[in-house]
C-alpha cells in the first residue's frame, strides 16, 4: 500500500513538472547565413518563412525576406551588414513588417520602421499596422467631391485637387516641387483652425526619401515655426540610410496615413520623391539577381508604385467617409516626362502638376506649365465660387502662350492680339506667389476674379502685386467671407464697384 501511494505521488509530480515544462517551451525556426554583402544576406534553413516577413540576425539587426528560392532565402538588411558574418544564426520573427500608427505619431519624426529619430523619447499610446495591405475595393470607394486646398492660386484655380485624389508633382531638380508640397501642409494650418469637427481636419504625412539630412532638418524647422508640426508626421529615409529603408519608407508613411482614412478622418500624404524609391528598389533587385528590364529596373517596378498609390482613396459613407490624398513627387532629367518612371506614375495618378526650369528662371513661381498640368477628377471637388471666378482663365492663358510665340518675331500685331498678350501677361503675374505664403480660398477667389474680369488690364506689371495686397487688406471682411458661398449678382455688383475703385490708383 505504501509503495503504491508513493508511486502515485511520483506520477503526479512528474505530470506537473512536464506540464510546466511545456508551458515555457518555445520553438524558433532558425537558419544560417550562407553569404552576405551589399546589404543582402543569403540564408539557408528558413523553410517556412513568409514573403515580407521580418527576421532578426544574431547581431540584433533586422531584415525582410524578399526572395524565396529552393536553396536559400534572399534577405535585405535594414541597417549595416558589417556585423553579420557567414554562419551566423538568423531567427524568424513570425510577423510581417508593421509600423506604429495613431494620433500619438503627430508632431514626431520617425524612420522607415516607425522608430522616433527626433530625440523626444518613445511613442505614447499607439496601434501597429502592416506596411503592405490591399487597397480599398471598388464598392468601398466614393468619387472625389471635397476640395483639398493647397493655398496656391495657380493650383486651386487651374488644377484643383480633391480629398482622396492622387496628384503627381513632376519636374526637374530645383524647380520648386517640394515647395508646393510644403505650402500645401502650411495651408492646412488655417483650414484646421477653422474646422468645427474631426471630419473637416486634414492631417499630413510627409515622407522624405533619399534626401539630405540637412534638408529634412530644415523642413522640421519650417513646420515647427509655423505650428504645422502639430498635425503632421514626418517619415525620413535619408540619403545615408540603406536602400531597403528608402524602399520601405513610402509604405510605412502610407500605413500611418491609412489610420486616419480608416477611422473616418482625412489625411494628406506626400512622397518626396518616388524616383529615389525606384532607384533604391532597382539596387535591391539587381543585388537579389532579379532579371533587369528597361533602364535596368525590374519588371515589377510599375506594381511597386501602383500598389502604393492605389491606397489613396475617398471611402464611401458606409465605410466611414474618410480619405487619403496622395501627392507623389517625381524628378525628371532635362524635362523628359517620357522616361520610364515618370510615364508609369503619370498613368497611375489622377493628374499632374508639371513644373519647368525655364519658367522658374523667368521668375514665374510656382513654375507651373498650365498647358501640361491637368487634374482629372479635381474639378468635381472645386468650389462653385472658384469655378465662377476662373471663368475663361485657362483658355486665355492657352491663347496667350500660342500668340506669345509668334509675337517674338516682332511683326505688327492687331488690337485684338495686343489685348490678348496684355491680358495674358497680367494673368501670369497674378498667378505668381511667394514661397511659404499660402492664401485662403476666399482671397484667391477675390484676386483671380479681379484679373479675369479685366481690372488689372491697364496697370503696369510691377504694380499688380501692390494692387493685390491693397484689395486683400481693405476689402470688407463680411464681403470676403461671403465669396466662398458663390458669386451672386448682388455680390458681383458690390465686388466690381470695390475693385474698380481700387484699380483707379494703379492704372496708367
UniProtKB/Swiss-Prot annotation:
Q: Provide the protein's localization.
A: Mitochondrion; Mitochondrion inner membrane
Where in the chain is the site Required for activity?
373
Q: What is its main location?
A: mitochondrion
Binding-site list for ATP: 171-178
Q: Which GO terms describe its molecular function?
A: ADP binding; ATP binding; proton-transporting ATP synthase activity, rotational mechanism
Alphabetized, the UniProt keywords read: ATP synthesis, ATP-binding, CF(1), Hydrogen ion transport, Ion transport, Membrane, Mitochondrion, Mitochondrion inner membrane, Nucleotide-binding, Transport
Supply the InterPro entries for this chain: ATP_synth_asu-like_sf, ATP_synth_asu_C, ATP_synth_asu_C_sf, ATP_synth_F1_a_nt-bd_dom, ATP_synth_F1_asu, ATPase_a/bsu_AS, ATPase_F1/V1/A1_a/bsu_N, ATPase_F1/V1/A1_a/bsu_N_sf
Asked if the Swiss-Prot or TrEMBL record annotates the protein with the keyword ATP-binding, the reply is yes
Q: Which GO terms describe its cellular component?
A: mitochondrial inner membrane; proton-transporting ATP synthase complex
Pfam families hit by this protein: ATP-synt_ab, ATP-synt_ab_C, ATP-synt_ab_N
Oligomeric state and interaction partners are given as: F-type ATPases have 2 components, CF(1) - the catalytic core - and CF(0) - the membrane proton channel. CF(1) has five subunits: alpha(3), beta(3), gamma(1), delta(1), epsilon(1). CF(0) has three main subunits: a, b and c.
Q: Which family does it belong to?
A: Belongs to the ATPase alpha/beta chains family.
Q: What does this protein do?
A: Mitochondrial membrane ATP synthase (F(1)F(0) ATP synthase or Complex V) produces ATP from ADP in the presence of a proton gradient across the membrane which is generated by electron transport complexes of the respiratory chain. F-type ATPases consist of two structural domains, F(1) - containing the extramembraneous catalytic core, and F(0) - containing the membrane proton channel, linked together by a central stalk and a peripheral stalk. During catalysis, ATP synthesis in the catalytic domain of F(1) is coupled via a rotary mechanism of the central stalk subunits to proton translocation.
Protein name from the UniProt record: ATP synthase subunit alpha, mitochondrial
Amino acid at each position: 500500500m505504501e509503495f503504491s501511494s508513493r508511486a502515485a505521488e511520483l506520477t503526479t509530480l512528474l505530470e506537473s513538472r512536464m506540464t510546466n515544462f511545456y508551458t515555457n517551451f518555445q520553438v524558433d525556426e532558425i537558419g544560417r547565413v550562407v553569404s552576405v554583402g551589399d546589404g543582402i544576406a543569403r540564408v539557408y534553413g528558413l523553410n517556412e518563412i513568409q514573403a515580407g516577413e521580418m527576421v532578426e540576425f544574431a547581431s540584433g539587426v533586422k531584415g525582410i525576406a524578399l526572395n524565396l528560392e529552393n536553396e536559400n532565402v534572399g534577405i535585405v538588411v535594414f541597417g549595416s551588414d558589417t556585423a553579420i558574418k557567414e554562419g551566423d544564426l538568423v531567427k524568424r520573427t513570425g510577423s510581417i513588417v508593421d509600423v506604429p500608427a495613431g494620433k500619438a505619431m503627430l508632431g514626431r519624426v520617425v524612420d522607415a520602421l516607425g522608430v522616433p529619430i527626433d530625440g523626444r523619447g518613445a511613442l505614447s499610446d499607439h496601434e501597429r499596422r502592416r506596411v503592405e495591405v490591399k487597397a480599398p475595393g471598388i464598392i468601398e470607394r466614393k468619387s472625389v467631391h471635397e476640395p483639398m486646398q493647397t493655398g496656391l492660386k495657380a493650383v486651386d484655380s487651374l488644377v484643383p485637387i480633391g480629398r482622396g485624389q492622387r496628384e503627381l508633382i513632376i519636374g526637374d531638380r530645383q524647380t520648386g516641387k517640394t515647395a508646393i508640397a510644403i505650402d500645401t501642409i502650411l495651408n492646412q494650418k488655417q483650414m484646421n483652425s477653422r474646422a468645427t469637427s474631426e471630419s473637416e481636419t486634414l492631417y499630413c504625412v510627409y515622407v522624405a526619401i533619399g534626401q539630405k539630412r540637412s534638408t529634412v532638418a530644415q523642413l522640421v524647422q519650417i513646420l515647427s515655426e509655423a505650428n504645422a508640426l502639430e498635425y503632421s508626421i514626418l517619415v525620413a529615409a535619408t540619403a545615408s540610410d540603406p536602400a531597403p529603408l528608402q524602399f520601405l519608407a513610402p509604405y510605412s508613411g502610407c500605413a500611418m496615413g491609412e489610420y486616419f482614412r480608416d477611422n473616418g478622418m482625412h489625411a494628406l500624404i506626400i512622397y518626396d520623391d518616388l524616383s529615389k524609391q525606384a532607384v533604391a528598389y532597382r539596387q535591391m533587385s539587381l543585388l537579389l539577381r532579379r532579371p533587369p528590364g528597361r533602364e535596368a529596373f525590374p519588371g515589377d517596378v510599375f506594381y511597386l508604385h501602383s500598389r502604393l498609390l492605389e491606397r489613396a482613396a475617398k471611402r464611401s459613407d458606409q465605410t466611414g467617409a474618410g480619405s487619403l490624398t496622395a501627392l507623389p513627387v517625381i524628378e525628371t532629367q532635362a524635362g523628359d516626362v517620357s522616361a520610364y518612371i515618370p510615364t508609369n506614375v503619370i498613368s497611375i495618378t489622377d493628374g499632374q502638376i508639371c513644373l519647368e526650369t525655364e519658367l522658374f528662371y523667368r521668375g514665374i513661381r510656382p513654375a507651373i506649365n498650365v498647358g501640361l498640368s491637368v487634374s482629372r477628377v479635381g474639378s468635381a471637388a472645386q468650389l462653385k465660387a472658384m469655378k465662377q471666378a476662373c471663368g475663361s482663365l485657362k483658355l486665355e492663358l492657352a491663347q496667350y502662350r500660342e500668340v506669345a510665340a509668334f509675337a517674338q518675331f516682332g511683326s505688327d500685331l492687331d488690337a485684338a492680339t495686343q489685348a490678348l498678350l496684355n491680358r495674358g501677361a497680367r494673368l501670369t503675374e497674378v498667378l505668381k506667389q511667394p514661397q511659404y505664403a499660402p492664401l485662403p480660398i476666399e482671397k484667391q477667389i477675390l484676386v483671380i476674379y479681379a484679373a479675369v474680369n479685366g481690372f488689372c488690364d491697364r496697370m503696369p506689371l510691377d504694380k499688380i502685386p501692390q494692387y493685390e495686397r491693397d484689395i486683400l487688406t481693405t476689402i470688407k471682411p463680411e464681403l470676403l467671407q461671403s465669396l466662398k458661398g458663390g458669386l451672386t449678382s448682388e455680390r458681383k455688383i458690390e465686388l466690381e464697384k470695390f475693385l474698380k475703385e481700387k484699380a483707379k490708383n494703379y492704372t496708367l
